[in-house]
Regions:
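N-terminal pre-domain/capping segments
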Residues: 1-106, 128-154
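Short glycine-enriched loops at secondary-structure junctions
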Residues: 63, 110-115
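Active-site gating loops and adjacent loop-to-helix segments of metal-dependent hydrolytic enzymes
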Residues: 117-133
Length: 156
């Protein structure tokens, strides 16, 4: 990572406007890696799951050829949604495994909000609340993701 005093800097595809992996207007991933290399930053946060190749045999050499290392990545997934738990845990497994293979060391969890939650964001009085049972299931799902990350040598 580029170091400045006690600050370590890394770049991410999100810096290039890649907020969602499936956006048809995203720039080509190899172009983004070329531009990150040209910026002088030598460490990468992998950005939205699915934007960069998920095969470490493809992505690893692409990063290495540009002198880029991996810090980790984030999971922007519907952790809140009980019905999508299997999908979320699958993404956690795939993503943690990829980060491990690329010698990264962290996984950041970002809960993808529902339309209802977005509509009331910043308005505490009208925001939807989880009941106790949902809160317990949510926290258990977060713990499961943390366990998956830990089994891959990552901090979550």
């Amino acid at each position: 990572m580029t170091t400045c005093a006690h600050i370590r800097l890394a770049a991410s595809p999100t810096t290039w406007g890649v907020d969602f992996a499936d956006n048809p207007h995203n720039p080509a991933w190899n172009r983004v890696l070329d531009e990150i290399e040209a910026s002088g930053v030598d460490t990468l946060e992998l950005g939205p799951v699915g934007y960069l190749p998920e095969d470490p045999q493809i992505l690893g050499p692409e990063l290495e050829s540009r002198g880029l290392s991996t810090a980790g990545t984030f999971m922007f997934q519907p952790i809140f949604d009980d019905a999508r738990e299997d999908e979320v845990l699958d993404v956690a497994r795939r993503t943690s495994g990829l980060v491990r293979e690329l010698n990264g060391d962290f996984l950041i969890l970002v809960d993808q909000p529902t339309d209802t939650r977005v509509a009331t964001a910043g308005r505490s009085a009208t925001a939807t609340r989880m009941d106790d049972a949902h809160r317990r299931r949510y926290l258990e799902r977060v713990r499961k993701i943390g366990t998956i990350a830990g089994e891959n040598g990552l901090r979550a």
